[in-house]
Amino acid sequence: MGGFVDDGAAGLAPSHGSSRAGRGLEGAGVFLRFVASLLSIAGLMLLVKDNQTVQQMVATEAVTLETKYSDISAFVFLLYTNGLVAVYCFFLALASVFSLIASARSGKLAGWVTFVLDQGLAYVLLAAAAASTEVLYLAENGDLKTSWAEICSQFGHFCHMARASIVVSFLSMLAMAVLSVMSAQQLFSKYRRPMTAKTAQDI
């Protein structure tokens, strides 16, 4: 006696399950993109406000010293990178929200573009945060070999703001790294072979 598995029953159940899982992943991605955008905005704003003016006595005269983020190229690089990540994540999150509401599915080309941009921006943000960390280390500790003096004893507020911006930027980078994994999973799931009904035979 032989049995036959109905094509509709065999194909629809896995399809609905994978569809729900896919939409759940997209929803998590939207939330994480808003988080990454907010973190990058916070890192950017901390740098924009990062300036300090102090007065130092030289002989009998008071000399005014000022430092700001724009004096350091690594901090400028970090600021623009955070701005780019914030704009990218915000608009892509909005596009994803409209896609979820309209129950529309993105194609493979859009998946590849998102995957490449997520990966690229994660690496660029990592590079910017790492370069800024090195500069901050020199500002806090100096370098005797190159005769660079530390400045954080004089510009404590400046160093504190820079440190906070770097920490927030690293958190945004971690969010981008997770998004890279998620976009890779969504992209390569489009290349999986569709499930087909199989004929079952009793021996």
UniProtKB/Swiss-Prot annotation:
Positions annotated with a glycan in the UniProt record: 51
Membrane association type: Multi-pass membrane protein
Transmembrane portions of the chain: 28-48, 74-94, 109-129, 164-184
Record keywords: Cell membrane, Glycoprotein, Membrane, Transmembrane, Transmembrane helix
Pfam families: CASP_dom
Quaternary state and interactors: Homodimer and heterodimers.
Name this protein carries in UniProt: CASP-like protein 2U2
